[in-house]
Design a protein with these regions (language model features):
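Regulatory hinge/linker segments at domain boundaries
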Residues: 3-25, 76-82
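Recognition helix of helix-turn-helix DNA-binding domains
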Residues: 31-64
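Basic, Lys/Arg-enriched C-terminal extension of HTH/homeodomain DNA-binding domains
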Residues: 55-82
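Positively charged, aromatic-enriched patches within helix-turn-helix-type DNA-binding elements
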Residues: 13, 24, 37-41, 59, ...
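Hydrophobic residues on short alpha-helical segments
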Residues: 23-27, 54, 66
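Short amphipathic helical patch at the helix-1/turn junction of helix-turn-helix
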Residues: 25-27, 44, 70
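ABC ATPase NBD switch/coupling site
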Residues: 9-12, 28, 56, 72
Length: 82
């Protein structure tokens, strides 16, 4: 029986620097309101960033975004949240 490897996680190259930062915060478990406060932006702007991240990476939800962030090494377990 042949085992096919899973395709690699989507490249993060499609994301802007700001979107990458938002993805980092999503992976750390922050809500839209918390991300907005941390980045000093409107909550609606955060929602827009989240939507763009999901669309660019062809993800269904935030949970998948968290998985991608860890699988690509964008965040690592136990790392500081700063």
């Amino acid at each position: 029986m042949l085992f096919r490897s899973q395709p690699p996680p989507p490249a993060l190259d499609a994301l802007t620097q700001r979107e990458t930062g938002v993805l980092r915060l999503i992976a750390r478990g922050l809500s839209n309101a918390e991300i907005s406060d941390a980045l000093v932006i409107a909550e609606q702007t955060t929602k827009t960033y989240v939507g763009r991240i999901l669309a660019k990476l062809a993800l269904r939800d935030r949970a998948q975004a968290v998985v991608v962030a860890y699988e690509t090494g964008l965040v690592t377990p136990g790392a500081a949240t700063n």
